[in-house]
Amino acid sequence: MMNLAQKIVASSFARLAFCACLVFGAFATEAMASDTLSIWVMDNGLGSKNAMKRLVKKFYRETGIPVKLTSLSWGEAFRKITFTFADSNDVAPDVIQLGSTWVPHFAAAGAIRPIDSLISKIDTSRFLGEGLRSTHISGKPETYAVPWFIDVRGFFVNERIWQQLGFDDSDFESYAHVLGVLKTIASSDLKTEAGVKVTPFALPGKDDWTGQQCMAPFVWSHGGDFVVPSGKGYRSALLDSNTLVGLALYAKIMGDAQMAPHSLFENSSENAEGFVRSERVIHYGTSELIKQLEFPEQAGGLANSAIAKDGIKVMDLPAGSHGKFSFMGGSHLALGNKKDTSKYALAEQLLAYMLRADNIDAFSRQVGFLPADRSILHIWNRDSRYSKIVAELEHSRSFPNIPEWGEVEKVLIDLSNNMGALFVNTKHQKKRSAALAQMVYEANSKINEILNHSDSLNGSEKMHWAQHIFLQDYNEIYPKSAAEIIGRSELPLVDEIKDKIGSCRYLLISVGAGFLALCIVLTCFRRKKKK
C-alpha cells in the first residue's frame, strides 16, 4: 500500500499530467485549426454538395490538410461575400466560387488576389477562351480566377410532342421558323394526361433574375448588344437599331397570349417546372436539366417526371439576321485576398487540386454542367444528350468583363420584369410599344450613368424610333405540318407573310391611289358635261 506521502506525490503527478494534456491538447487543436483551409461554394444543384464533400475528403487524404466546406445559396452569395471581405476579413474564405460575371467586380473591390504565378502550374491553356475572358478585368493583364464549369443555355423540346406534331429539326433553323412553330403549337388541341392544355413556350416575366440571359440570344442573333466599347470605357447599346430588333422579338413572344401565355406570371424556375410537367413543348434552359433526369424523385430529381417519360431533345440554335448565339456563363474559382497571408501557399495548393482535370470531370458529372476544361469536353461530346450542347459553345458568348457589369445586370433584370408587368396591364399594341420604348430609353440612361458615359442622344427621336421598331412585324415561317394542325384556310401563304410587313403602308398607298383615280374620273366627267 502507498503511504500518505506517496499518495500525495502520485496525486500531484496525476494532476500535473492532466494539466499538461490539456495544455498540449489545446496547442494541438490550435495548430490543427491554423492549418484548416476554408472554401466557399454555391449550391450548384442536385449532387453538388455530396460531390464537394468527396473532393474535400480526397484532398485531405492526399495532403493531410483539412478543409472547412461552406455552401451558400446563390441568392445570398453576392451580399455575403461582399460583407465578409469588407467587415471580417479574417473569416473570409481561402478559396471561393464566383459566378463568371462576378470576377471583375470582386477583383476591382480587392476581395480576390491575382493568380498569375499559378498559370503554368494549373495550365490555363486547357480552358475555353470565352471562359478565360472573364478571369480578368477588361483592359488589365492580371488574372484573378480560373473557369471551373460552364453554364451554357440551349433550346430543349419535348421529344414525344415534337414528333407527334410532325415537326422536323429544320423547322427550328431561324427565329422566323421558331415563330411559325410556336403559333402552330398554339393552334393545336394537345393536353397532358392531367387534362392541362399544352402551351408552346414561356419566358420569365415576373420576379425573375435571369432576364438578361434570356434576352441575350435574341439580341446577339440580330447584331445587337447590351453595352459596347466607347472611347476608354463602355456605353449602353440598348437604343442601337439591331438591339431594338432583338428586344422587339423577345417582347413579341413574351407578350403573346398564344405563343407564351404563362410568361407574364412566371419566373425562370416556374418556366422549367412547366416544361418538366410536359405542359410546355419548348424550353430555354441549362444543361443541368439533362442530369436531373438521372436522379430519383426522393433525391429531388426528375427520373419519375412527365418529361423523363416523353424525352428531351436538344435543338440547334435558331439563327437571326446576324447568326446564331447563346449565353455562356458558369463559375470560376478564385483565391481570397486576406490580411493573414500565412495560409496562402496552402490555399494555392487547394485551388490547383480543384482545377485538376480529374476533379473537374468528377464534379461536372455530378451536377450536369459542362466542364470548363477542353481536354474533357471531347468525352462529353460522345454522349448524344450533350453533343449539341457542346457544339453550341462555338456560338456562345459571355457578358463583358467589366466591374460595373453587376449593376448593369440589375437594370436588365428590371427591364425584363417590367416588360412582363407592362404586358399584363396594357393590351393595346400601340400603347404597349410606346410604353416599352420609354422603358428601354430609361434603362439605357441608367446604364450610361453606371458606366459614367455622357449621353447626348435626342430622347424624343430615339423613343420614336424605338416605338417604330417595336411596331414592326417579324417574318414567320410555318412548318410543313402546320397545314394539318392549323387548317389550310387559316395558314398564311409565304407571299402573304412577306407582304404583311408593308401591309399598312400598302393600304395607305392603295387608298390614296383610289382617291386620285376617282378625282380624275370626276374631272373628266365634268369637262364632258360642259361641252
Briefly describe each language-model feature range.
Residues K58-E130, R160, Q164-G166, E273-G274, ...:
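Extracytoplasmic "Venus flytrap"/periplasmic binding protein-like
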Residues G99-G154, A194-G195, G211-C214, I307-P318:
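Hinge/lid segment of periplasmic solute-binding proteins
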Residues D116-L128, T199-G205, G224-V245, Q298-I307, ...:
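Short, solvent-exposed loop/beta-turn-alpha elements that line the ligand-binding surface or hinge
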Residues H136, E142, Q164-L165, G255-P261, ...:
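Extracytoplasmic/periplasmic substrate-recognition and gating elements
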Residues H136, K309-L317, S364-A421, Y478-P479:
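Long, aromatic- and glycine/proline-rich binding clefts that accommodate carbohydrate-like moieties
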Residues K140-W148, R153, H177-R235:
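Extracytoplasmic/periplasmic solute-binding protein
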Residues V181-K183, P229-F265, L317:
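Glycine-centered hinge/linker elements that transmit conformational signals in sensory
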Residues E394-R527:
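Conserved C-terminal helix/tail region of periplasmic/extracytoplasmic solute-binding proteins
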